[in-house]
């Protein structure tokens, strides 16, 4: 009976949508024949709610695990740029695919108004090359720049906008970590004169991030590595970007 109770608790906690009948069937698959009332008694004894209440309180970890392959996240960062009339603030938007850590530079503007965000939404959901196309969920904070029209555009493409609670950066940790990386490794180390110089730096960093930078969250692997020699025989070379701000060491082919 102890094994049955352990299994009932496990099935219910790992599968928030499973009701008594579904749990009963899973137990039968393992050779345990029990009545639905037994499952109900066990759940109550262990303080576990019935399926409807359990499903409504699905843990964040369970949600991420269930939809990991189809979740993306988006966020803005700001960068100060010098122009003809002094310093201006540019808003830079990025999107990230959680499973692969691939990042997309979605655009930048000094005025992220509704028209601009709607155009970005069209680009992100484009059925040919939209970064969010075929994603099911998109995590975002409650920034007013993610307008109702923008969220409706995502929803119309089959992507559910998941608006996170205020002051909860840990729930969007993947894109927050990317923002810290691009700031500390690139943007905070440079002074920008005009939008074009910032755009070039962002594109160079994103290329470095994908093809040259190791990622601890991926077992210290590179997301999209370039071909490397199979034997450690060639000379070690350094590829520099942005005048040496970014460096990648590799071997020449022997």
Language-model segments: what does each one mean?
Residues 1-254:
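Charged DNA-binding/catalytic regions of mobile-element recombinases
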């Amino acid at each position: 009976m102890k094994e049955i109770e352990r299994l009932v608790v496990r099935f219910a906690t790992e599968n928030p949508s499973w009701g008594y009948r579904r749990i009963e069937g899973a137990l039968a698959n393992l050779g345990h024949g029990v009545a639905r009332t037994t499952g109900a008694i066990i759940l109550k004894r262990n303080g576990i709610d019935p399926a409807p209440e359990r499903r409504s309180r699905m843990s964040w970890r369970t949600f991420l695990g269930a939809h990991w392959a189809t979740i993306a996240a988006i966020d803005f960062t700001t960068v100060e740029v010098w122009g003809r009339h002094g310093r201006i603030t540019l808003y830079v938007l990025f999107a990230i695919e959680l499973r692969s850590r691939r990042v997309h530079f979605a655009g930048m503007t000094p005025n992220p108004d509704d028209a601009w965000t709607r155009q970005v939404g069209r680009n992100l959901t484009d059925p040919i090359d939209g970064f969010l196309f075929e994603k099911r969920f998109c995590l975002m904070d409650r920034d007013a720049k993610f307008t109702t029209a923008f969220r409706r555009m995502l929803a119309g493409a089959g992507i559910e906008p998941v608006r996170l609670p205020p002051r909860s950066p840990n729930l969007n940790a993947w894109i927050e970590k990317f923002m810290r990386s691009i700031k500390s490794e690139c943007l905070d180390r440079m002074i920008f004169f005009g939008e074009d110089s910032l755009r070039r730096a962002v594109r160079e960093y994103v290329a470095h991030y994908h093809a040259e930078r190791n990622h601890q969250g991926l077992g210290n692997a590179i997301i999209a590595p370039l071909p490397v020699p199979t034997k450690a025989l060639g000379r070690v070379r350094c590829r520099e970007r942005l005048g040496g701000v970014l460096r990648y060491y590799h071997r020449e082919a022997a």
